Amino acid sequence: MNSKPIPNDQFRDAMNELVNGWFKKWRDRQGMTDADWDTCISELTELGHKYNYKLVLAIGAALVEEIERRQDGGN
């Protein structure tokens, strides 16, 4: 895990992939199966490894919580 601040260009790229790619793909999916969740988390893990900064992982975790709330009908 990289403990240095994330460079602006990498932060911008990470946010684009997290929000406009990964989150957009999963945010409105209803009735996710265990296989869906496995794929969702696996994709997020890959992004976490790609960027390897605590901030990216924390934002990813927050987005997973949002997807969980939406699954519970909280949107």
Located regions from the model:
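Short, charged, amphipathic alpha-helical segments
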Residues: 34-42, 57, 61
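Short, charged early-sequence alpha-helical segments and their helix-coil boundaries
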Residues: 49-75
